[in-house]
Amino acid sequence: MARDFDVIIFGATGYTGEHISRELHALASKGGAWQGVAWAIGGRSQLKLSAMASKHKLTPAGVVIADTADAASLRSMTARAKVVMNATGPYRFYGEAVVEACIATKTDYVDLCGEPEFIDRCLLKHADAAEAAGVLIVHACAFDSIPADIGCLFTALQFPPPGLCAHADMYHTFDVAADAKGAAAHATTFYAAVHGFGGVGATRAQRKDSPPTCPLLISCCLLAT
């Protein structure tokens, strides 16, 4: 089935969604692999989405309205894209409905979630349906996960057979702009962290219910980072 857009950035007026929109626009403007990609921005408010695009002089191929509280609007949105980049958080409250809509419309899904409870829940509840639909559900594509995953993969590749990397430690170092005054985190990141630490017990209990074959490796790594 033909799709209107290659990519929709959902939650484009949020802190992270706005940044993603700006970066994607810059990539598309430079040509290369992103040249000709039809990307759109999505969210609840046409006014806010249009204002954000105008503010940064962005040229998305479309503006799509959808709300995580309205399943029909989500399916209408996801059906128009090949891939949805979901930037609406905290994911434990707003993410699952988007995952469900993507599976229903056979749309690939990517997020930047760092919330183990949400990732585990999606694996437990939706992995089989996603596989049956041929849909990719890719979590944790952000700074707290990508360096760990790529770093571990790089390290493992340094051990040619019969060598084997059995353990790897990863450390993050963050550079802050010289003119920054104090450390800061966006409100959604703060709320996600509060609920994440507050729900550690529930996350552990959820993992005890996991079948032995459930692939919880990614979210286990997230807890350690």
Mark where each language-model region is:
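N-terminal Rossmann NAD(P)H-binding glycine-rich loop of SDR-like oxidoreductase domains
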Residues: A2-K30
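Conserved beta-strand positions in the Rossmann-like core of class I SAM-dependent methyltransferases
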Residues: V37-I41
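N-terminal Rossmann-fold cofactor-binding loop
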Residues: G42-Q46, D67-T68
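Short, conserved SAM-binding/catalytic segment
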Residues: A51-P60
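Conserved Rossmann-fold cofactor-binding substructure of NAD(P)-dependent oxidoreductases
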Residues: V64-Y94
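ADP-ribose/adenylate-binding Rossmann-like module
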Residues: P90, A101-I119
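Rossmann-fold NAD(P)-binding glycine/threonine-rich loop
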Residues: C113-V135
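Active-site-lining helix/loop region of Rossmann-like oxidoreductase modules
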Residues: L157-T225
